Curated annotation (Swiss-Prot):
Keyword tags: Cytoplasm, DNA-binding, Transcription, Transcription regulation
GO molecular function, a single term: DNA binding
Claim: tRNA processing is one of the keywords in the record: no
Major localisation: cytoplasm
Name of the protein in its database record: Probable transcriptional regulatory protein MXAN_7062
């Protein structure tokens, strides 16, 4: 087990420091999960995972319950997940994951952000091949026998396991699987009584690119602008 290399997060995860935006994103995730599998987390593994992320973000229980109730109602908003691809300045590839109830509005806004920050919104498939979609779990390492855990999870889809750092600088164990094995690995982790700090699918850059600080800052300004958009859930890039 080694240290997992992760692309720069200085602003990639900036929204997690803006609580209202965090809760909006999670509320949409709840709505999508409930729509797909119902409001009971015991029988809906996707919802169960989203609720774990809500707890990790310190989302108040009343807000979580309200989001589930709204998503269960007949007038619930029907969100569509749309992935946009493009380039930031200096050839850095971006994947922009959105959850929208108005695709026309969303694509116009995403294009505006790219244009304003010297980027280029591309077509489907233009940069997706530079990433691998994976299931990513982050665990608190306290009390874990990491060698034993790694051996046990290999049979359930584990591909990579290594050390990482959380948003507040805390140590974490990062576990990755192929996206197709996400559910299987989630079940194996839960069967061991472990509660992940977070669990989600992510687009992991295959070949991260290093840039000088001044050029990297230009890229991250576009990433930050996209992340502030109401329809954008997450932004992935291959900036090292």
């Amino acid at each position: 087990m080694g240290r997992i290399f992760e692309t720069r997060k200085a602003t990639m995860m900036a929204r997690w420091n803006k609580m209202a935006k965090v809760f909006t994103r999670i509320s949409k995730d709840i709505a999508i999960a409930v729509k797909a599998g119902g409001p009971n987390p015991d029988s809906n593994s996707t919802l169960r995972r989203v609720l774990q992320n809500a707890r990790a973000a310190n989302m108040p229980k009343d807000k979580v319950d309200a989001a589930i109730k709204r998503a269960s109602g007949q007038s619930a908003t029907d969100y569509e997940i749309v992935l946009y691809e493009g380039y930031a300045p200096h050839g850095i590839a971006l994947l922009v994951e959105t959850a929208t109830d108005n695709v026309v509005r969303t694509v116009a806004n995403v294009r505006m952000h790219f244009n304003k920050h010297s980027g280029n919104l591309g077509t489907a498939g233009s940069v997706a091949f530079m990433f691998q979609r994976m299931g990513v779990f982050r665990l608190n390492p306290e009390g874990l026998d990491l060698d034993s855990l790694e051996l046990e999870l290999i049979d359930h889809g584990l591909q990579e396991m290594g050390e990482g750092v959380g948003e507040k600088g805390e140590k974490q164990i990062i576990i990755r699987s192929a996206f197709a094995d996400f559910g299987q690995l989630q079940a194996a982790i839960e069967a061991k009584g472990l509660v992940p700090v977070s669990a989600d699918s992510e687009y992991v850059a295959l070949n991260p690119i290093e840039l000088p600080e001044d050029k990297a800052t230009e890229v991250l300004e576009l990433v930050d602008a996209l992340e502030q958009d109401d329809d954008v859930q997450r932004v992935f890039h291959n900036l090292a």
